Each structure stands twice: as structure tokens, then as C-alpha cells.
């Protein structure tokens, strides 16, 4: 019992390091180049493609789609962006957030101690605030990877729990069970990047034969889709008390993820086959972290590919769902 409690503490400790590292990285980047990023968001949204690419790039730098979505909502409230400009940026933010999963699948956490050392060194050695911001960002990256390493080392004994194995068996039998598990995980942690990292760590544990994953790709995908749905709650919370357009962009974010998750769940086997086609071959437990990262990127990329040409229709849809006060609802 005591050993199980210690293992749980290790998992939560690793998760805390991951979240703090992500937050430190995001804050350091915002302090260092935040004004330029905000200027980039305001200027580079002339057309939907530019907005998509800008959203993806800014999110990849900040390592937080929630931060970009909240920034977009603030710009809408301030009148710096129009709704038609903001929606593609949110689509791009969903793509940019997949960078973390791809980095973790490359196992670059082996550089974590060097990143931590260089980050602290820069913070101590640099006299100007910009150099210290770079140091804090590098340190945040190192802390992020250290958190993942701690979670991975804790997963092996944790997965010996009969209760957890029973839950994993339920997830494998029911995609809906996995979807709800992913939503609950992200609602609890408030970070889809953290829950995807946790999923990668859990899925990479080998089964009884030492070849297959304990979870499997078709069981991991619904959890991943749930993670993507859960992250829309942050935008909804940020839109509370804001103007009508802020609520509409939060609704567009939710529709983007919900519609994509519904289609992928309905076409689970073909989607899993596409992911395997785009991923390296080998023992399942050795390649599943990459498969999950690729599934994350494919899901958001394909959703953006479908919805980007329909930006106008999305804007009309959210305006119809959330009409201006004292105005009748628009017809779709």
C-alpha cells in the first residue's frame, strides 16, 4: 500500500515538473518576445492561411495552445482582431500544440540535464533581462523533459495495479470510455500537452510478451481525442465575461475539436491504419509514443485542412448559435 502511494506521488511529482516547466517556458517567452508575438498575431492574419500558420508558429514557440487562445480572445475583446481573422489562428494553435508530443517521441529528454544546467547558467551569468528570459526558457524546457522522465519511470510499477489494468481493459473494449477518460484527464490537469505526455508514457510500457504495448494504438487514440476535447474548456472559461465574439471563437474551438473527434471515433480503424502508415515500424511498445504523436498531429492537421476552407461557414455557424443581443438568430 505504501509503495503504491509512493509511486502515485512520483507520477504526480513528474506531472508537476512538466506543468511548471511548460509554464516557465511560456512566461519566459512572453516576457522576452511577447510584444513581438502579439504584434505578429495582430498583423499576420490577413487571410485564413496566414492566420493558421501564425497560430501554429506562435503556439509552437509558447508551447501552450491555451495561452494563444486566451491571447486571441483578449485581442477580440480589444478590437484588434475580427472574428473571421481569429478563427484560423485558433485552428493553427491546435496544430502548434502537437510539437511537444513530437519532441517527446524523439526521446530528446536525454538532453534534460544539459538544458537545466545551461538554463541556470544563463540566468546567473546574464545581466540583462532578455538573456535571463532565454535562460528561464531553456530551464523550462529541461524541467519539462525531466517531468516526463519521472513519469515514465513511475509508470512501470503503477501499471502493475490490478485496478488500473481493469480500467485499461475497459478502455480497450470501449472507445467511448477512453474518450471520457481523456476529457477528464485534461479537465483535471488543464493541459492537453501534459495528458498527451502521460498517455505516451503509459502506452510505451510493454505488455506480457515484451513486444506489444500495454494499451495499444486503437485504445490510445480515443484517449487522445478526449484530451483534445478537454482543452477547449480553457477557451470557454476565458470567454466568460467577455464580448460576444470572444464567446464565438471559444465555440469555434469546441466545434473544431468535437467534430473531428466524432469523425475519428466513427472511423477509428481507418484512422489508426493511417497513423501506422505514417509511423516507423518495429515492436509496438517501442514505436507507440511516435504513433501517438503522429496521431495528434494528423488529427489536428486534417481537422484544419477540412475547416480552413469553411472558415466563413464556421463564423456564420457560431454567429447563429450565439447571436448579438436584441437581434434575431441568423439563418445558417
Q: Where is each model-derived feature located?
A:
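Helix-loop-helix hairpins and the membrane-proximal interhelical loops
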Residues: 2-48, 138-184, 202, 212-213
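Hydrophobic core segments of alpha-helical transmembrane domains in multi-pass membrane transport
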Residues: 11-23, 55-59, 117-126, 140-150, ...
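Membrane-interfacial helix-loop connectors
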Residues: 59-62, 68-96, 103-111, 119, ...
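Membrane-spanning helices that line or support transport/gating and their immediate boundary helices
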Residues: 20, 24-32, 36, 40, ...
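Alpha-helical transmembrane segments of multi-pass membrane proteins, especially transporters
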Residues: 15, 35, 39, 43, ...
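Signature of multi-pass transmembrane helix bundles
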Residues: 5, 82-90, 102-152, 168
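Transmembrane alpha-helical segments and their short flanking loops
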Residues: 148, 152-171, 214, 238-332
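Interfacial loop-to-helix junctions that mark the boundaries of transmembrane helices
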Residues: 1-9, 102-111, 165-170, 218-221, ...
